[in-house]
Amino acid sequence: TPLYSSAASDVYKRQGEGGPELAKAMLGKYYEIQYPEVIAVVLKGSPKPWVGPMDVALTLIGAVFKNNFVKNRVLEFIGPGVSNLSMDFRNGIDTMTTESACLSSVWATDEKTQEYFTIHHRPGDYKKIQQGALALYDGVVEIDLDTVVPMIALPFHPSNAYPLKDVIAEPLKYLGMVEEEAKRVFENNKEIHLNLKDKIFNGKIKVDQASIAGCAAGSFENICAVDQIAGKMEHGLGTFAFNIYPASQPVMTELNKTGVINDLMEYGVRVKTAFCGPCFGASDAPGNNDFCIRHSTRNFPNREGSNPANGQIASVALMDSKSIAATAFSGGFLTSAEDIVTEFHVPEYHFNEKIYDNIVYNGFGKARPETAMLYGPAIKDWPEMSTLTENLLLKVVSVIRDEVTTTDELIPSGETASYRSNPYKISEFTLIRKDPEYVGKAKEIQEFEKARVSGDVKKVETIYQILSTVGINAPASELMQTTGIGSVLYAKRPGDGSAREYAASCQKVLGGLANICIEYATKRYRSNCVNWGILPFTLAEEETDLAPDEFLYLPHIRQAVADGKKQIDAIVISPD
């Protein structure tokens, strides 16, 4: 299983991790991981025609995320129900498994898998994988596909999963729940006011926008199903905004050949190029206070492109493509695919490899070290980073008491994507949606570390004076040699969601030297912290009274790391 720099890599059967893990591998280092526990996901039966892969995925995520049942474990999909699912259906479930907090996922293979490899001109790569007669697992999740119903994940997490018919039947109850959740999520931003109850007309929820996009939704089979629902409804969209992004150029080409794209465009659907933009706010950003439905991987706060610093808020609910199509062609009123009686059939798919052969350069094993690298003026190298000193003096610059902090909150997606080649620029967005004061506070304490490195005794004297309150009275000139200065972030469970290493590297660029939490939401994020030289501390207590602007003094921390100590002592120093 190769490493891949994306949390959504499950669909390609790669292990999704942050970029530094790939860099280590390219340097000949090992990928370090404790042998994971394995959870059997036993599938039985067959899904109803109106049920899609997102419905199965949300059923799973809703059952296991909040109780941590599969956290950092490998999911192994087995059972008689697997053979009743097409490969597109399996991939649609698989790309969502990351949202369960699992480490990765694997599937039993069969004749359909073999056919899939043959279609993609790779018959020799197929391997039959089945569980042994005496296979043992660390836990079991059973899903009866016959009983899965159309689902909806309400804002602001895929685990907020409910049967779609329940939300349709009681709109005030469920939209009221989302409004209350928004108050909690944005409690520090008094400019945010989410009012979803305004979306209820004559007892029905009116949606503002719909999108189907990316690895989770843009499959050939999904989009063909949308076309067939559109044909059943026999009318156009009117003014309702419905956008579809195929998962790849080969998929788009085949949809074009079969006439599906032409059909959808005639009905008023905006069919766009292969791109996952709506998933992370890079396209189709909704209007303020809009309520959107999407078949994509995540619906975290502001991930859809709104900017809370400007008082903006929108909300995204996740649904399967079939129910999204049913809603879109019902005037935007929330509708289950179960209510649209349709016979689904999938045209034969043909993979056109020329699309990649004619555009992708395969340089593997063809090193050309003489080739000059081209750098534009906006591409910047990483700053010099200080070596870990014997002791550390850290200022608490942010305390986040949410139960889970996502990587989207640590560093937003969308508008930041264009700055990924400039570590200084992108770091300016760190925690901007959750704690707008973080960047300024981190930079303020970082100036003292810069002064320490440059030998500015006069400047660092003012920060080292705080150590005298705990009996450390050495001169600043001496402390400069032994005690580094930086910032620390506290969050209960940081790192859910994307594998993006910027969630850690941006803290480091701003002088962040440690995280403290109850537990890390994912191994990926903890590994990113380690790889960027951020100390990943945990506190067993469910709650801590650590407060912003307090200091932590960590004596002999370098030696503790070298010795592999599992517990260290720290001194909390109040600024008063």
Language model regions located:
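Short gly/pro/ser/thr-enriched loop/turn and capping motifs at secondary-structure boundaries
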Residues: 113-114, 250-251, 278-281, 300-301, ...
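Flexible inter-domain linker/hinge segments
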Residues: 131-132, 147-151, 333-408
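Single conserved hydrophobic/aromatic residue that forms the stacking wall/gate
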Residues: 1-8, 12
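Accessory "access/gating" subregions that flank catalytic or transport cores
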Residues: 79, 98-238, 244-259, 263-266, ...
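Acidic, glycine-rich flexible loop/linker segments
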Residues: 274, 303, 343-345, 523-576
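Short hydrophobic alpha-helical runs that function as membrane-insertion/retention elements
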Residues: 105-107, 270-273, 513-518, 536-539
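Extracellular/luminal Protease-associated
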Residues: 78-82, 482-521
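Mobile "lid/hinge" segments at catalytic clefts and subdomain interfaces of large enzymes
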Residues: 10-118, 277-278, 283-360, 530, ...
